[in-house]
From Swiss-Prot:
UniProt keyword Isomerase present: no
Domain writeup: Has three domains with a flexible linker between the domains II and III and assumes an 'L' shape. Domain III is highly mobile and contacts RuvB.
Organism: Stutzerimonas stutzeri (strain A1501)
Name the record gives this protein: Holliday junction branch migration complex subunit RuvA
Span list, region Domain III: 153-201
Assembly and interaction partners: Homotetramer. Forms an RuvA(8)-RuvB(12)-Holliday junction (HJ) complex. HJ DNA is sandwiched between 2 RuvA tetramers; dsDNA enters through RuvA and exits via RuvB. An RuvB hexamer assembles on each DNA strand where it exits the tetramer. Each RuvB hexamer is contacted by two RuvA subunits (via domain III) on 2 adjacent RuvB subunits; this complex drives branch migration. In the full resolvosome a probable DNA-RuvA(4)-RuvB(12)-RuvC(2) complex forms which resolves the HJ.
Location of this chain's protein in the cell: Cytoplasm
SMART domains attached to this UniProt entry: HhH1
Gene: ruvA
Keywords: Cytoplasm, DNA damage, DNA recombination, DNA repair, DNA-binding
Amino acid sequence: MIGRLRGTLAEKQPPHMILDVNGIGYEVEVPMTTLYRLPAVGEPVTLHTHLVVREDAQLLYGFAEKRERELFRELIRLNGVGPKLALALMSGLEVDELVRCVQAQDTSVLVRIPGVGKKTAERLLVELKDRFKAWESMPAIATLVVEPGSKTAVTSAENDAVSALISLGFKPQEASRAVSAIQEENLSSEEMIRRALKGMV
């Protein structure tokens, strides 16, 4: 199991990134909550990782904090929740927001996530309630390493944002509308994704 990677950010194409570790490029899929905190390409970064081995592929998932990785592991243990849905949930909600949602048994937020209907949301909340009791006092630890003053380069930011939203399960029309609704100019793709998700979830 690969539990942690430290290297140089080589590429960033939401929701994927490539981390160069001593000349080897690891393709890592990350939730948007981690993507927001990535530094510029060429900067050092440390990720907490989870490896999924399938018959046809080995998939690596990366997270800014250990508690995010633990949440991912809790989610994929649930019936009917695979890595894609787990990342969609974590991209739409911060860890603490999801914990509060489970504590309040509030389905209204979850049903806005792609792939989560009302019945699925209700089942997830019931199954997660007992599992999340220990999370109430669990501190945020091992934050992603980001160099001070790092800035993300903006290249076709709108297209990247739309592509990332589609990869999370949103329909192309929904993704385009959400990005087009953002009024501010000169935003990075990560900031566009963040604002679009806030408007959709």
